[in-house]
Amino acid sequence: MLEIRAVQPADNKELAATLRGILIEMGVPKVGTAYADQALDCMFETYDVPLSKYFVVVEDGQILGGAGIAPLANFEGPVCELQKMYISSSLRGKGVGRQLMQKCLDFAREAKFEQVYIETMPYMKAAQQLYVKSGFSYIDGPMGDTGHSACPVHMLKDLNNDA
C-alpha cells in the first residue's frame, strides 16, 4: 500500500540513499545540485523547522521518493521552494508525483506562502510536465540562492491564482 507522510527521524539513512540513487539514475551532476546537499543525510532535522515540511513516499515499508517545501533561501518575501522532489522509477507515471505535489502545495498554502519556486534540469521533461500541469510557469532566471548552480531551469507558481 502506498502512503505519503511527513519524514520521520528514522527515515534519514534510507531516504538519503534513495534520493541519491534516483539522482544517479537520472544523470544529475554531483556538484551544484541536490546530490551534494548535506541536508540529504539529515532530512528530518532539515525540515523540522517552522515553515518547512518534507514528505516521503512509502510503499510496502520502503521509501521510494519524496518532496518538500521550505522558505526560498536568500530571498525576501512569502516565497517557498519545492525541494528535492524525486520519485523512484517504479512509481513514475502512476499519479504519485501529482499526489506528492498536492501535499506540498497544500502545506505551502497553510504556511501562507504566496509563490512556489523550483529549479530542475532541462532533461527532466516528465517532471516539468507535472510542474506545468500543477500551475508552474517558466521564468527567465533563478530566484534566491539555492546553491544549485547546475540547475538551469527555473519555474514559479502563484498560489493566489489557484481555484
Where are these regions (language model features)?
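Conserved glycine-rich acetyl-CoA-binding loop
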Residues: Q62, F75-E76, K84-Q102, E110-A111, ...
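Glycine-centered loop/turn positions within well-structured domains
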Residues: K13, K94, V153
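Acetyl-CoA-dependent GNAT
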Residues: L2, A6-Q83, S88-S89, M101-K103, ...
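Generic intrinsically disordered, low-complexity segments enriched for polar/acidic and small residues
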Residues: G32, D41-F44, L51-S52, Q83, ...
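C-terminal "cap" of GNAT-fold acetyltransferases
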Residues: G21, E114-Y117, M121-S134, Y138-A163
